[in-house]
Amino acid sequence: MSYQVLASSQNDKVSKIVRPTTTYQPSIWGERFLQYSISDQDFSYKKQRVDELKEVVRREVFLECYDNVSYVLKIVDDVQRLGLSYHFENEIEKALQHIYDNTIHQNHKDEDLHDTSTRFRLLRQHGFMVSSNIFKIFKDEQGNFKECLITDIPGLLSLYEASHLSYIGENILDEALAFTTTHLHQFVKNEKTHPLSNEVLLALQRPIRKSLERLHARHYISSYENKICHNKTLLELAKLDFNLLQCLHRKELSQISRWWKEIDFVHKLPFARDRIVELYLWLLGVFHEPELSLARIISTKVIALASVADDIYDAYGTFEELELLTESINRWDLNCADQLRPECLQTFYKVLLNCYEEFESELGKEESYKVYYAREAMKRLLGAYFSEARWLHEGYFPSFDEHLKVSLISCGYTMMIVTSLIGMKDCVTKQDFEWLSKDPKIMRDCNILCRFMDDIVSHKFEQQRDHSPSTVESYMRQYGVSEQEACDELRKQVINSWKEINKAFLRPSNVPYPVLSLVLNFSRVMDLLYKDGDGYTHIGKETKNSVVALLIDQIP
């Protein structure tokens, strides 16, 4: 931490401006992603081969699978985990509906743990009503999971994955998670060379439900290739599709990197975090499909501006400067730029307003109304940043409940979900934006998850400088508990938020599906970047490895 002391003169009076700045780690990527090109001929060839393989899968894999439930489960699970589900949404829906209609009311006493757990997980992932009581057949007379299950590693792993689809109050799934976690940890400790050891290790680190789809696919493709019974067509398609999408994503990142260099915030606002690559990774974790390219580009630019704004309010601007900036943001008028001081705030303000104007042009007249909702969400976010700056300026210590009224906005996830929707074109309607503007419950659950995971791992670093209290400090004071007790309670609330998000998928859902998908995937990104530390501010090994896996290394 450092304090910048600047001199300013007004009416021949000299005053000192003290800025509680901090030093952030510079970008570790340099200009690596600035330029990228692929020959049109090579891209077209790969695209043609992908299309050919998709038809083979439809003709030879899905059309042959309905008579054997175990086979259906395996194909659907493999297709999803290989990152191919967006190509076969109709086929997957039809297959799962067939499984649901033909098995949900049957007696499953003779089923093995693996198939029961896989069916449960796949159906719940897609919103089908399926009771967790089906796992009672795997318990003994004392109500404990049977000891004989301990040696069934595929079954244990499948039950472990299924347990992450639980709702609040489903004790049997909580027990299943504890049971499987204990014995799977013991397995990887004792059986390091077992064929399933690496797959179990990855699952314990991050279950399917909390994994970024592309990152999970990257790992699973390698695992799938090593399976004796793998489908060669699916494997070839998965590899080609991953590499083809990576080309598109690299091209997008190159475009975004050039924009980032052009606005030159790295030099004009040197106090802010330089994380454009990590921010693109963030959005790549939310949606990866080719048709959502515009949504990724728009959303990455906006989250980059929000990150810079966070650093302006958090670690640079004086209260007076921030007050004027916030007033200007609310007015949203380029004529306000000239009154902003210092010059870097003018620069930020102009870039912010110009970006939203460009978004309107890119979307076209019929879609431009969506930008209004994104702009209002950004205003609200920066207003929350200012409320936290006011707490610091006034030395005010909010209660935990009072804190949440502001910090569930300042976490930024409502703004980002609204912004992500504006580039999704036909997927969303004006009613969806109106519904989101009313702060529905699923957004509160998503924001709780985001805010608490962030604060648990970052509050100590933030408190090293002048900083408003986090939810951790507010919880400690309101309830008179230790830091560890506060963090433990916030973690419990994160777990409950995951369970509420799971339940929101239950059909029929009153939540628009694009919103459900965004909530789930934004939550997954939090688990990647904030589970074991602030992997965004302090670029950790996992963040770096994820960038390499998704944006640098191709699959041979």
UniProtKB/Swiss-Prot annotation:
Ligand binding ((2E,6E)-farnesyl diphosphate): 273, 310, 314, 451, 454
EC number: 4.2.3.57, 4.2.3.104
Residues holding Mg(2+) 1: 310, 314
Superkingdom of source: Eukaryota
GO BP, sorted A to Z: diterpenoid biosynthetic process
Tissue: Expressed in glandular trichomes two to four weeks after flowering onset.
Binding, Mg(2+) 3: 454, 458, 462
Keywords carried by this UniProt record: Lyase, Magnesium, Metal-binding
Reactions catalysed according to its record: (2E,6E)-farnesyl diphosphate = (-)-(E)-beta-caryophyllene + diphosphate; (2E,6E)-farnesyl diphosphate = alpha-humulene + diphosphate
Pathway(s): Secondary metabolite biosynthesis; terpenoid biosynthesis
Cofactor: Mg(2+); Mn(2+)
Residue span of motif DDXXD motif: 310-314
Annotated transmembrane regions: none
Gene Ontology MF annotations: magnesium ion binding; terpene synthase activity
Residues reported to bind Mg(2+) 2: 310, 314
Cofactor note: Binds 3 Mg(2+) or Mn(2+) ions per subunit.
Pfam entry (one): Terpene_synth_C
Family the entry assigns: Belongs to the terpene synthase family. Tpsb subfamily.
PANTHER family the UniProt entry points to: (-)-GERMACRENE D SYNTHASE, OS04G0344100 PROTEIN-RELATED
Known role: Involved in sesquiterpene olefins biosynthesis, constituants of cannabinoids and terpenoids-rich resins. Catalyzes mainly the conversion of (2E)-farnesyl diphosphate to beta-caryophyllene and alpha-humulene. Can also use (2E)-geranyl diphosphate as substrate with low efficiency.
Domain-level remarks: The Asp-Asp-Xaa-Xaa-Asp/Glu (DDXXD/E) motif is important for the catalytic activity, presumably through binding to Mg(2+).
Protein name: Beta-caryophyllene synthase TPS9FN
